[in-house]
């Protein structure tokens, strides 16, 4: 696919990009593509109208392993937007033991800050590399101190001609890797992070304590002896951190959260009330989680350590299998906040064939590449692919339907012997055909008891 500015991709281009990684589920791809394009459209509106246009949240309905999570994850990567995936079952009603739903937005803010900090470091990379080189050269060629009140920074800017010639020579050797094994002594910043365990529901307090201890130790450094090869990445990272303006990063990250953030809530069906015949304690608790989620989806202000995040324009994508519950079992207020409903279909044998061969990082390509590292040339005949897809479909039909994840189990079992013996088979070529598949898996597929526990 040609290079396209992802911010201005059309829905058709977004679907084509998703097709490179995910097989089928065209309706779901269309829905998320339109939602992403609507974000761009909204940003073109006058500010007064822009603030009135709310995102159309999406509810994905379909069995496990059909691509719900992968579609949302690929969409976030494509949009280069802050993205967080959570399970609805991890959260509890306020006042009970468990995670507070506002932690979702705090996690989103953490993701955004990390994303924008890395982008800022990429922008200053060249400058950071030059500074790191200067520090290495200073360690190799200490500058001559002259006079009272000698300023090494000023000396760095105005070196003598002899020093300059020597530094140019050493800089060239440094860039060519000729000095990589030389040991130097450097002042390196100390990482003051501390791991603090907190009880469930008190993660925010743990974060604040970690931040406090980190601030207490900031600015400290220690002398370390390192090879130039090991010191260089450390110094580049340290210098890039100095060049990045943290206030600008936080401001940009908060804005990105509010305008482009994507929250994927999995297993939303597990917090739906099941049936109409009376309410158990579990139903009451599940309804409480829904009511706590409601303000986030409707739009509210959430305090994070980087500032306040408004959730009005964050895109929420919820998903669930809805085997025991129906979308209508969600509380009406929450149903209304997910106006776009998309049903994902169960995968067939034909889908499994495509999953094994078509995506950019198809499973078969992954296993071929893994064994190639051992010098084993692995290839799959077309009849083997067909037989693998048939076996996966059969086992899914007879046992629990876990969708495409069944292919991982089947392939691991199929290649178990070959993976074990690969180091001893360097230089060999192995072709997997239908006969090989039947020899390795035939007995397991025919015996329902064995396939239940092994496949």
Swiss-Prot record:
This is ATP-dependent protease ATPase subunit HslU. Belongs to the ClpX chaperone family. HslU subfamily. SMART domains: AAA, ClpB_D2-small. The keyword Magnesium does not apply. ATP binds at residues 23, 65-70, 266, 333, 405. A double ring-shaped homohexamer of HslV is capped on each side by a ring-shaped HslU homohexamer. The assembly of the HslU/HslV complex is dependent on binding of ATP. One of its GO terms (molecular function) is ATP binding. GO terms for biological process: protein unfolding; proteolysis involved in protein catabolic process. It comes from Xanthomonas axonopodis pv. citri (strain 306). The keyword ATP-binding applies. Keywords: ATP-binding, Chaperone, Cytoplasm, Nucleotide-binding. It is found in: Cytoplasm. Pfam families: AAA (PF00004), AAA_2 (PF07724).
